[in-house]
């Protein structure tokens, strides 16, 4: 039996970043069983709050936005429609695009898909768009990479510190990959043990699915690493003095 080649977990999650946040509210809108969510958050007097209208130094979080919402955001904030749509395409590659009035950062984030009562692991794009006055996130579905910020479970998070927020998102993303990689590693060992005592195809198929997840994760993490390296060289991303502090 061929054994899965497991990547070095520490090597795959090398991101030179720290993390951090406070309290938040949640609002959802459903349409034909699919959630379309646009939420706006802002740090007010040291705490994170959900607000009704965009303001300077706010965070606009868009989950599976409609075509109308994308067009409205594009018209209002001068962001290209294609750049707002890009994170909604599962085939989009991780990259950085620097425009005149904003910067688009695309990275892959891990996700869980349930099939046949089992959890399988894959990746979807997350877009981070940084303008001079605010920051946007765009994703096809709610991701645990961002929910910690929304649920008030990250300390010292401030929407006006855009560079720090980006690095916090990337750090959170790396920790989620590490968490899922450990689960995949453990599941692989369990399935391999079953294979020694069984000749059924079920275990072989499960092992192949886990191997596919590892390939997705490995490819995505390498692409994300390239994005991070380029990000640290982008002059349009303002560096705040506080961003260099070590947060514990």
Predicted features along the sequence, with ranges:
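Peripheral, non-transmembrane regulatory/ligand-interaction domains of membrane transport proteins
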Residues: 2-247
């Amino acid at each position: 039996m061929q054994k899965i080649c497991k990547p070095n977990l520490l090597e795959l999650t090398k991101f030179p970043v720290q993390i951090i946040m406070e309290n938040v509210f949640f609002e959802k809108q459903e349409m034909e069983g699919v959630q379309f969510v646009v939420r706006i958050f802002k740090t007010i007097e040291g705490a994170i709050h959900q607000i009704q209208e965009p303001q300077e130094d706010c965070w606009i979080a868009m989950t599976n936005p409609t075509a109308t919402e994308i067009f409205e955001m594009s018209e209002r904030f001068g962001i290209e429609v294609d750049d707002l749509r890009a994170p909604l395409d599962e085939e989009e590659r991780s990259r950085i695009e620097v425009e005149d009035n904003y910067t688009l950062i695309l990275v892959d984030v891990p996700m869980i898909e349930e099939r046949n009562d089992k959890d399988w692991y894959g990746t979807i794009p997350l877009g981070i768009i940084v303008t001079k006055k605010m920051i946007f996130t765009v994703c096809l579905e709610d991701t645990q990479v961002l929910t910690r910020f929304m649920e008030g479970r990250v300390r010292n998070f401030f929407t006006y510190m855009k560079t720090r927020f980006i690095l916090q998102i990337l750090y959170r993303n790396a920790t989620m990959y590490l968490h899922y990689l450990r689960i995949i590693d453990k599941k692989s060992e369990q399935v391999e043990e079953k294979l020694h005592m069984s000749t059924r195809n079920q275990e072989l198929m499960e092992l192949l699915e886990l191997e596919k997840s590892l390939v997705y994760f490995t490819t995505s993490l390498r692409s994300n690493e390239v994005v991070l390296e380029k990000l640290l060289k982008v002059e349009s991303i303002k560096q705040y003095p506080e961003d260099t502090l070590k947060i514990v």
